[in-house]
């Protein structure tokens, strides 16, 4: 078997195992929606809710909104804006996390129907603006009165921010019947999560993934929401992108997902009975990072005294999570010594390559030794070309005499695939790489592609001229040629396509990938080139003994 065929076989085997890995990861570790089972269905959304969106006519609502006032609040981590119209939170920006325009990331966007990040259907009963009261630096009240079925109610929304800089807002809903002798005619209401975390243009699509996914966590399971799915007593429900999310938690809540105007929303049912309302919602709005999310698993770690909320389960974990955890720790150690995440990726790559060097050494040495047998192998192929059985016997005899395993170069490569996938997942999703600069003016954000020129529009498939993909392609091509142990002139046309096609193919695949991933790839290629020189010297010394 020729060397090019062996390499091609290794590529096919690699692709096969990549496919198997993706299937396993998709089946066991992706967050798919469960089927709507009897256990999960606990209510009928339209039947149980008697307050709809038509309580106030459109013109009246528009006039009310036009006369409302905005209330600006600044905390250690948020820029928040409230409106006296419905007492809504209409803007929530993260002070410490900037977008590509170097502005605070917006977590709330009010849509054309004036729906905010979240809203309460009780708002539809109000016919007056809310009054505002600043209780203290962290607590803000919005209050109004309204009439329903001939009875008068006092309606209060109380927002409380953390005094410890946590990405959590406590929202308390109070509804009191002003006539204490009367029972309430409002037996339930909806809390609707309809978040729209800031998305970027095509240029930054890989930074934010430009999509929202709804999720719910219940019975120790994380699932994506879908139209018609209802869940009893989940720990939380929320929406998220690649790096940010909004999660809502409340005791004894029931949730149903429903499609409205092509938008999937999460409806939280709150049954009241004939009593006054006093409900508390905890709303996490911030980075999708366990360092922030896990603070709410122990009451002594957060200012709200929350425990076992399990917000951290919203962070997707792959099949190779157990490998990614030590890798992340190593990156963090390097960053603590040299505060540059780009260098941390390079050092991590070198450490990983050193650790798996015995495998790669065996693979490259087997390939190098096998290439030395090419003249003898060709003689056997010519001599027994009409006798396949004898050909295989003689080839096997040659391998045994020379002490060479023809598959010795394949299996070590396959064993390295889990490490590659783990590194890819870590570099591609690690929150701290977002906005992290490596080389200012060139690689300003490791979570997106590098750029030396931005077109302002799409040219073919691209929006930017990038340098790292070209460096990656050249270094991979050099690495492939050096590893082949075959002169360029001796390659046939198909072999040349094989050798040059892979680097070019990866160039197009990885062109818009995060620069942190390309730094890993380039470092790997350079390490492989240096490693191959060492292996060639080692093989040469062995043959001279």
From Swiss-Prot:
Its main location: membrane. Belongs to the OXA1/ALB3/YidC family. Type 1 subfamily. Required for the insertion and/or proper folding and/or complex formation of integral membrane proteins into the membrane. Involved in integration of membrane proteins that insert both dependently and independently of the Sec translocase complex, as well as at least some lipoproteins. Aids folding of multispanning membrane proteins. The gene is yidC. The chain crosses the membrane at residues 10-30, 319-339, 341-361, 407-427, 467-487, 502-522. One of its GO terms (cellular component) is plasma membrane. GO terms for molecular function: membrane insertase activity. This is Membrane protein insertase YidC. It is found in: Cell inner membrane. The lineage of its organism: Bacteria, Pseudomonadati, Spirochaetota, Spirochaetia, Spirochaetales. Keywords: Cell inner membrane, Cell membrane, Chaperone, Membrane, Protein transport, Transmembrane, Transmembrane helix, Transport. It comes from Borrelia hermsii (strain HS1 / DAH). It is a multi-pass membrane protein.
